[in-house]
């Protein structure tokens, strides 16, 4: 009974953790309301766009930690891979459908990245590298995020085939990739029409 109670409690805590709008709070400390500034998105990329790199680094760190910490707790409690994945999913759901923002939120790139970095560093690190390289070349956050998601999906498939990744973790990664693509559908439309926002100034 206790593991079940602990699992349920951790899922709820993960959702609440994911719901904390770190990017919105950091931007507010800089005197900016993300909901009416930049792209209007409450994610870390919009913090960079509207508040600068220092604020972005804080927001990114917070958004990653709110995915990573519940996942680490689930692993520390010895939960099964499936239960750990459910906890990570709850954190991502909290970010995208925050109880503190009227069940709206960001696009789960940083929070999902924190979960994947905890579950499978060999999946997350190539994704982070792909994000950095793609963003440096294009200066378009959506392109970098979608590229990173694709690389993580491929890395998960390779590691699963090599027996180096639990199937539940691989399925989580692929589900996260699908969710990130879905949440970027408006960005994809703007990319097709050539109207997607590009960073003019990085630092």
From Swiss-Prot:
Q: Which GO terms describe its biological process?
A: phospholipid biosynthetic process
Q: Which UniProt keywords apply?
A: Cell membrane, Lipid biosynthesis, Lipid metabolism, Membrane, Phospholipid biosynthesis, Phospholipid metabolism, Transferase, Transmembrane, Transmembrane helix
User: Which residue windows are transmembrane per the record?
Assistant: 5-25, 50-70, 72-92, 115-135, 140-160, 162-182
Q: Name one Pfam family in it.
A: G3P_acyltransf
* Keyword Membrane attached: yes
Record pathway: Lipid metabolism; phospholipid metabolism
GO CC terms in record: plasma membrane
Alphabetized InterPro entries for the sequence: G3P_acylTferase_PlsY
Compartments in which it is found: Cell membrane
Q: Which HAMAP family match?
A: PlsY
Q: What does this protein do?
A: Catalyzes the transfer of an acyl group from acyl-phosphate (acyl-PO(4)) to glycerol-3-phosphate (G3P) to form lysophosphatidic acid (LPA). This enzyme utilizes acyl-phosphate as fatty acyl donor, but not acyl-CoA or acyl-ACP.
Q: Whom does it interact with, and what assembly results?
A: Probably interacts with PlsX.
> What's the protein name?
Glycerol-3-phosphate acyltransferase
């Amino acid at each position: 009974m206790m593991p079940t109670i602990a699992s349920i409690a951790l899922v709820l805590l993960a959702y609440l953790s994911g719901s904390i709008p770190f990017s919105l709070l950091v931007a507010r400390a800089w005197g900016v309301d993300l909901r009416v500034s930049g792209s209007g998105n409450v994610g870390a990329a919009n913090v960079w766009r509207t508040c600068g790199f220092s604020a972005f680094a804080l927001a990114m760190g917070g958004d990653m930690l709110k995915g990573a910490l519940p996942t680490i707790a689930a692993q520390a409690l010895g939960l099964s891979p499936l239960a750990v994945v459910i906890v990570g999913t709850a954190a991502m759901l909290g970010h995208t459908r925050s109880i503190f923002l009227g069940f709206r939120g960001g696009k789960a790139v940083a929070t999902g990245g924190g979960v994947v970095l905890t579950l499978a560093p060999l999946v997350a690190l190539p994704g982070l590298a792909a994000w950095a390289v793609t963003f440096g070349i294009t200066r378009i956050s959506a392109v970098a995020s979608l590229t990173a998601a694709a690389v993580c999906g491929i890395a998960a498939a390779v590691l699963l085939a090599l027996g180096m990744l639990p199937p539940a973790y691989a399925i989580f990664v692929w589900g996260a990739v699908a969710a990130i693509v879905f949440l970027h559908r408006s960005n994809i439309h703007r990319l097709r029409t050539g109207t997607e926002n590009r960073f003019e100034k990085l630092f």
